[in-house]
């Protein structure tokens, strides 16, 4: 399947969304009429969503921080006892400034923002960045999650370049979750991988990503990996936290303090 943006069209799900669909098409440089399109970026009541166009296609993928899995995890996810919280160094009185350099659909960044961290997110793929931007805009308009969304700042572009030319105070913690060839086998993740892999592929530049992160982060770098996957080539992690399906490799530089 081609990853070319020429095989993506933008379409409104109702006439009332035609103007917004036109704005997205112009912003992303995508057509609104394309009979041979393999994907549709759809605009509707629930916001922006990406739909694979084939007979047995799974449902659309969108970013939703207000309802569904994100809301459930926000309410019942285990708070600062979650492994990701321990990995980035959240402790009583410590909420590090985090850069999520491989944002994807923003789930991990949202968890960290829910726990009180200021999080910058980098996403290099324009379609995924658009979904993320739309999800953050809807979250900002919701009374329950607006304060969380306000702690999240989206940056679009190549993470290595953005880190190498970072301006301002460096993040204390940089979080990386590179796309890996063999990932979580849950139905939701399978659906998302089927949609996104044609666009993003595997992160073959993960070693360069880690190197740039280690240069920029002031306190630590955290890399999420499938539990049995090897560490990224290059510097060795100082220690790891292991869960049922994932592992967090921690590269400490300096102790986080309140």
Curated annotation (Swiss-Prot):
UniProt superkingdom: Bacteria
Entry GO MF terms: rRNA (guanine-N2-)-methyltransferase activity
Intracellular or extracellular location(s): Cytoplasm
Keyword ATP-binding: no
The keyword Endoplasmic reticulum belongs to this UniProt entry's keyword annotation: no
InterPro entries: 16SrRNA_methylTrfase_J (IPR007536), SAM-dependent_MTases_sf (IPR029063)
A GO CC term assigned to this protein in UniProt: cytoplasm
Annotated S-adenosyl-L-methionine binding sites: 107-108, 123-124, 177
General function of this protein: Specifically methylates the guanosine in position 1516 of 16S rRNA.
UniProt record similarity statement: Belongs to the methyltransferase superfamily. RsmJ family.
Designated name of the protein: Ribosomal RNA small subunit methyltransferase J
Species for this entry: Stutzerimonas stutzeri (strain A1501)
């Amino acid at each position: 399947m081609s990853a070319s943006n020429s095989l993506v069209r933008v379409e409104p799900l109702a006439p009332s969304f035609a103007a917004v669909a036109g704005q997205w098409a112009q912003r992303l440089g995508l057509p609104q009429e394309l009979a041979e399109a393999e994907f549709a970026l759809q605009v509707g009541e629930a916001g922006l969503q990406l739909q694979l166009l084939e007979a047995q296609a799974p449902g659309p993928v969108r970013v939703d921080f207000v309802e569904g899995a994100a809301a459930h995890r926000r309410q019942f996810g285990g708070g600062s006892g979650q492994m990701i919280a321990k990995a980035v160094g959240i402790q009583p009185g410590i909420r590090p400034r985090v850069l999520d350099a491989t944002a994807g659909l923003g789930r991990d960044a949202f968890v960290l923002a829910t726990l009180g961290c200021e999080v910058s997110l980098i996403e290099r793929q324009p379609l995924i960045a658009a979904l993320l931007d739309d999800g953050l805009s809807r979250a900002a308009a919701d009374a329950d999650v607006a304060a969380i969304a306000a702690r999240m700042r989206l940056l679009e572009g190549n993470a290595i370049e953005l880190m190498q030319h970072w301006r301002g105070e460096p993040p204390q913690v940089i979080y990386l979750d590179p796309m890996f060839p063999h990932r979580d086998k849950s139905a939701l993740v399978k659906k998302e991988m089927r949609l996104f892999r044609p666009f993003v592929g595997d992160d073959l530049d993960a070693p360069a990503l880690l190197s740039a992160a280690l240069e920029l982060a002031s306190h630590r770098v955290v890399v999420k990996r499938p539990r049995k996957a090897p560490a990224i080539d290059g510097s060795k992690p100082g220690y790891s936290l292991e869960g049922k399906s994932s592992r967090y490799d921690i590269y400490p530089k300096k102790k986080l303090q309140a």
